[in-house]
Amino acid sequence: MVKIRLHTTVSSETARKIEDLKKKHRTTSSVVEKAVDLLYTSENFSRLGDEDLLILAFIRELNFMLCAKDHYTALVEGDAERAVRESMIEMAVKYLSKKPISDLDFEELLSVVARLWNLLNRAEHAEVQKDGEKLNFVFYHDMRSKAVSELHLNLLKYLYEKYYSKKYEMQVDTITVNGFSVLFFPKDSVD
């Protein structure tokens, strides 16, 4: 590699740091080259968006891949009911919302689930649409499998039944190989 001579001035504090770093890296050139490499790396790191950083934290802090082992094992074995029971969805919702599920209103819960599934690439698109008091949860994926749609619908149904079934009615609008749409109505507004 061709070397280029540089001449520059630095503050006395920077010069002291370079001298200190030379103990490990041996030469001023090595220190400067390492610093430039780190600057390039950190600038590329800053290109990561908030969602990228969140998924990295999510995996690290919850040890998500290891903890989800039983869920994925159940999926591979074709045991959809066990996959729902052993899902980490409750822990993931609490992590993303920074609240216990019992403190979330239903629309908040649905929004967190949509965000979670988008974040984890479980969905091509997931969102909550509000029409007056009616909530419509739309989930779209590109796996072309009704079983995938049913699994995610059952995860949502699990949360609904555990936390919100006393206040809301649930009506599956449609379910296909590419997703589902489910409507929720407050119980007092159901005719």
Swiss-Prot record:
This is Uncharacterized protein AF_2020.
